[in-house]
């Protein structure tokens, strides 16, 4: 895969340039564009993934299915499809926004900051997973309500963005509706 960049955003969340992804994620990470996607299988189960230990931020924590950064000139939907293929080796369908205006700032225990405008989507996996071990060290298909209970009981075991997204009542209801269709 070619070197990835992040799209930097100004105070009005408008693109203001790009920066190499690993250079962007520091102790003073600038605001940038990202995405988060929750994948469900045909049985309505949610795919939770455990981040590889080689990840710069939040290595080894459980998180929603796939996250990433749209590249300059790429739509968020195109970026989600690209990262699903790269990280999970999976094709998706029915890509649906569930929390389009989510943004957050969080600091990893090692000091790395995430500072993202991060629209959240749900999608349906349509093929068998072929996980990229450089991105994902483990995964599990689980019932959404079971994942929600785990998030409430042990939020420290999950990425902060996953906890924040699921903690938003409207987003949680949309995810629950999505998995039940």
Curated annotation (Swiss-Prot):
Enzyme class name: isomerase
Subunit architecture: Homodimer.
Required co-factors: Mg(2+); Mn(2+)
One Pfam short name: NUDIX
Taxonomic source organism: Salmonella agona (strain SL483)
Cofactor, free-text remark: Binds 1 Mg(2+) ion per subunit. The magnesium ion binds only when substrate is bound.
Binding site for Mn(2+): 25, 32, 69, 114, 116
EC number(s) reported in the record: 5.3.3.2
Pathway where this protein functions: Isoprenoid biosynthesis; dimethylallyl diphosphate biosynthesis; dimethylallyl diphosphate from isopentenyl diphosphate: step 1/1
InterPro entries according to UniProt: Idi_bact, IsopentenylPP_isomerase_typ1, NUDIX_hydrolase-like_dom_sf, NUDIX_hydrolase_dom
GO cellular component: cytoplasm
Location(s) in or outside the cell: Cytoplasm
Keywords: Cytoplasm, Isomerase, Isoprene biosynthesis, Magnesium, Manganese, Metal-binding
SUPFAM superfamilies named among the record's database cross-references: Nudix
One GO term of the biological process aspect: dimethylallyl diphosphate biosynthetic process
Catalysed conversion reaction: isopentenyl diphosphate = dimethylallyl diphosphate
Name used for this protein in its record: Isopentenyl-diphosphate Delta-isomerase
Main location: cytoplasm
Protein's job: Catalyzes the 1,3-allylic rearrangement of the homoallylic substrate isopentenyl (IPP) to its highly electrophilic allylic isomer, dimethylallyl diphosphate (DMAPP).
HAMAP family reported for this sequence: Idi
Similarity section: Belongs to the IPP isomerase type 1 family.
Domain (Nudix hydrolase): residue spans on this chain: 30-164
Active site feature: 67, 116
Example GO molecular function: metal ion binding
Record: residues binding Mg(2+): 87
């Amino acid at each position: 895969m070619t070197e990835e960049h992040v799209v930097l955003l100004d105070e009005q969340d408008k693109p203001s340039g790009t920066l190499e992804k690993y250079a962007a994620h520091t102790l003073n990470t600038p605001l940038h564009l990202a995405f988060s996607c929750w994948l469900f299988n045909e049985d309505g189960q949610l795919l939770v993934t455990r981040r590889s230990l080689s990840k710069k931020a939040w290595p080894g924590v459980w998180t929603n299915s796939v996250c990433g950064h749209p590249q300059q000139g790429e739509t968020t939907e195109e970026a989600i499809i690209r990262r699903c293929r790269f990280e999970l080796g999976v094709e998706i369908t029915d890509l649906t926004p569930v929390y389009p205006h989510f943004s957050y700032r969080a600091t990893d225990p090692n000091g790395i900051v995430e500072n993202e405008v991060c629209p959240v989507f749900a999608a349906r996996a349509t093929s068998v997973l072929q996980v990229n071990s450089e991105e994902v060290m483990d995964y599990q298909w689980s019932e959404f309500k079971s994942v929600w209970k785990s998030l409430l009981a042990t939020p420290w075991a999950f990425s902060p963005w996953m906890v924040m997204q699921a903690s938003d009542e409207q987003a949680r209801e949309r995810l629950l509706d999505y998995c039940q269709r």
